[in-house]
Amino acid sequence: MTPTNTAIATALFSQLTAAALGYPIAWPGTDFMPPATGVWLEPMVMPNTGIDNGLAATDTTIPQGIFQVGVFDRPGRGVLAVNRAADDVKASFLKNATITGLVRVQRNPYSFEIQPDADRLSVIVTIPYTG
């Protein structure tokens, strides 16, 4: 059976929790106050249109999407801490790792820095998945 987007999101969030990286996590839809100092994470699952695996209405659809984890820090400490934390997140989602059922990490995770805001430095980790 093809996992639902909710099942995939649950598995991704569980895997991030199980990695026990030591950073506070702002889960989607929950109240969260970012720390005054130090790194924190903000995960978001973005399902994409599935790949139809045939022409019949009963054929399966292959799920795909991206899991992004925003890695944030307060300015003043430089970019090394936030990039180290991004590397920790990437190391927790290796290429071909099982997410749930047949859903796997599709490619090596990658990250990029976003223009800093007045109150935060940002690195976004992208983890593509397909199943």
Language-model features: where?
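Small/polar-rich, solvent-exposed N-terminal microdomains that initiate assembly or binding
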Residues: M1-D59, R77-L80, R84-A91, N96-T100
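A generic structural signal for ordered secondary structure
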Residues: F13, G38, G65-F67, A118-R120
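Acidic-leaning, charged glycine-interspersed low-complexity segments
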Residues: G22-Y23, D87-G131
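Sterically constrained small-residue positions within well-ordered secondary structures
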Residues: P34, T60, I114-A118
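Oligomerization/assembly interface segments of phage tail-like spikes and tubes
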Residues: D59-G76, L121-G131
